């Protein structure tokens, strides 16, 4: 720098991502100065947003609502990427999504693709029936492959209402029956007073969610009501109008927690609906031919209604002979119809 008079000066050295350094110098003539800057880095504490392994005899993983919100799932199948060894991948909702725990088999081997039947799904203490799910045509079709009796379709389970999930990969407790290859225990949110809304859109699907909670009372007698609705419209390939899938789920849940000096009681009633609105799938090349007769027609109707109740009582004194009791009951009605018509022409070989 030219034109400086002799005297004392303060030099300040600064650069992005480096600590600023100030030096006092006495200027008497020309001189050279070198200054080494130290990187300015701040190390934050490790933050893990993933599933938590339970420390116990059974191999199980617990997924909280914070981890669920982090990955922004479209269906329950997206949560499996939080399990040990899970891989993140784009959601494909054009075909049923089946769980595969404690098994190396996949849907690629159709003769042994029934491992998902051995995994029990529990929602708020009640089992999810997976023994009468058709989901697709019972034979080859231009509108989809066959996935009959392959297990619970995870596309039907809305993730927005989930508070936490426990996935047991080891041997589950004896109180859970009708399972051979794992347990998925889902607990949904209860209470709260906020209005929640969610919209998600990508190249293949659009999702809308709206939910509201109500609660009143005190710790001795607390009552809650939760209501929600979720709509999903998926198109795996915009060029294939036949490979689409639409789902509507709604839920109304009532809960009551009572507490006195001796016992803690909990009572809940759930009303749930799941519907798939594929309806009649169409394709210009298949619906209209030169003879005026379609090659194939396809119509699917799926509606599921369920009512469940649960009651539990627990002693606040662990030294008493009676400690706890829990009972649950549920009724489910499913209407799953698939109507398919194919044109078959006879010819000479």
Question: Residue spans of the language-model regions?
Answer:
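Transmembrane beta-barrel wall of Gram-negative outer-membrane proteins
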Residues: 196-233, 239-286, 291-326
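N-terminal periplasmic accessory domains that precede
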Residues: 32-36, 76-79, 98-100, 122, ...
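Short, polar/charged loop or turn motifs at beta-strand boundaries
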Residues: 59-82, 100-109, 124, 142
């Amino acid at each position: 720098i030219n034109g400086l008079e002799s005297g004392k000066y303060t030099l300040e050295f600064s650069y992005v991502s480096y600590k600023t350094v100030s030096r006092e110098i006495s200027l008497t003539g020309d001189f050279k100065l070198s200054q080494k800057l130290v990187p300015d880095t701040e190390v934050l504490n490790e933050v893990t947003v993933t599933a938590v392994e339970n420390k116990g005899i059974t191999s199980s993983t617990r997924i909280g609502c914070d981890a669920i919100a982090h990955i922004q799932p479209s269906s329950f199948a997206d949560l499996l990427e939080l399990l040990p060894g899970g891989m993140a991948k784009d959601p494909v909702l054009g075909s049923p999504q089946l769980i595969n725990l404690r098994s190396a088999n996949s849907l690629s081997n159709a003769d042994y693709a029934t491992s998902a039947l051995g995994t029990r799904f529990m929602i708020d203490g009640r089992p999810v029936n997976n023994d009468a799910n058709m989901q697709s045509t019972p034979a080859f079709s231009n509108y989809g492959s066959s996935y009959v009796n392959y297990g619970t379709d995870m596309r039907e389970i809305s993730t927005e209402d989930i508070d936490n999930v426990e996935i047991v990969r080891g041997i589950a407790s004896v109180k859970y029956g009708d399972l051979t290859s794992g347990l998925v225990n889902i607990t949904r949110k209860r209470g709260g007073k906020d209005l929640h809304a969610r919209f998600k859109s990508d190249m293949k699907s659009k999702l809308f969610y709206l939910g509201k909670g109500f609660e009143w009372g005190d710790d001795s007698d607390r009552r809650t009501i939760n209501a929600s609705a979720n709509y999903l419209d998926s198109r795996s390939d915009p060029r294939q109008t036949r490979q689409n899938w639409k789902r509507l789920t709604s839920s109304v849940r009532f809960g009551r927690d009572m507490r006195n000096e001796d016992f803690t009681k909990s009572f809940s009633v759930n009303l749930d609906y799941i519907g798939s609105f594929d309806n009649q799938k169409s394709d210009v090349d298949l619906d209209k031919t030169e003879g005026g007769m379609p090659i194939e027609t396809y119509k699917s109707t799926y509606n599921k209604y369920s009512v469940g109740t649960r009651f539990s009582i627990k002693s606040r004194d662990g030294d008493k002979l009676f400690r706890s009791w829990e009972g649950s009951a549920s009724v489910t009605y499913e209407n799953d119809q698939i109507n398919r018509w194919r044109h078959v022409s006879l010819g000479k070989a």
